[in-house]
């Protein structure tokens, strides 16, 4: 994904989940929209370098959207969770994710399940000749980096994330593929695991989902700059203990 020209600034504060005050190079202070509703541990530190996307849409309440930040020297994190599905879909279409290659069609935000959910990506029509079932892909954005370099999800208790795992289990029971894709949006993360210390119920549900046949894949950036973000580097995933 190529970004439009972004404005670099310095983060002053993130507050009320959806707002971030940023100082631009000339000293102007602006308020940007923050799409990430999680705790954003480690990726919303005041003083960090950030990149904003401006908009000329007069209907927007906030002119700027917060897209990237620099958690440490030489690292970038894409904190705009609204881009995760598009980045994974782009990688699938380009053939960069082998486990999800060979499908004829891809649809987004399709209603499914017993709990009124929408699947992020639905891959249909096996074009490989291998006779694979349709694949329901749930995408989760990972920006929480632990001290050892592991990425962990979720960064806060998430009943919704556990619900999505239950829906994937139902999909598998019905004869389809159900796959949880951890989209690693932090260039410093080297592997992924469930954050059982933050949300033990999610970790237990993920263990149950794995035992039920749900697949898990972690993919990180092949390229991460303020001009381009390419998803598709498969990363190790450590399953929760039984």
Where are these regions (language model features)?
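Active-site metal-binding core of divalent-cation-utilizing nuclease and nuclease-like domains
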Residues: 75-82, 93, 97-143, 163-166, ...
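Conserved hydrophobic positions within beta-strands
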Residues: 9-11
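Short, charged beta-turn/beta-strand-edge "cap" motif at the junction between a beta-strand
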Residues: 13, 54-59
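Domain-level recognition of nuclease-like catalytic cores that cleave nucleotide substrates
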Residues: 186-242
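Nucleic-acid nuclease catalytic cores
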Residues: 149-159, 166-198, 220
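Short nucleic-acid-contacting surface segments enriched for D/E, G, S/T with interspersed K/R
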Residues: 37-51
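Short aromatic-glycine-enriched beta-strand elements
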Residues: 16-21
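Short, Lys/Arg- and Gly-enriched loop/turn segments at beta-strand edges
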Residues: 57-68
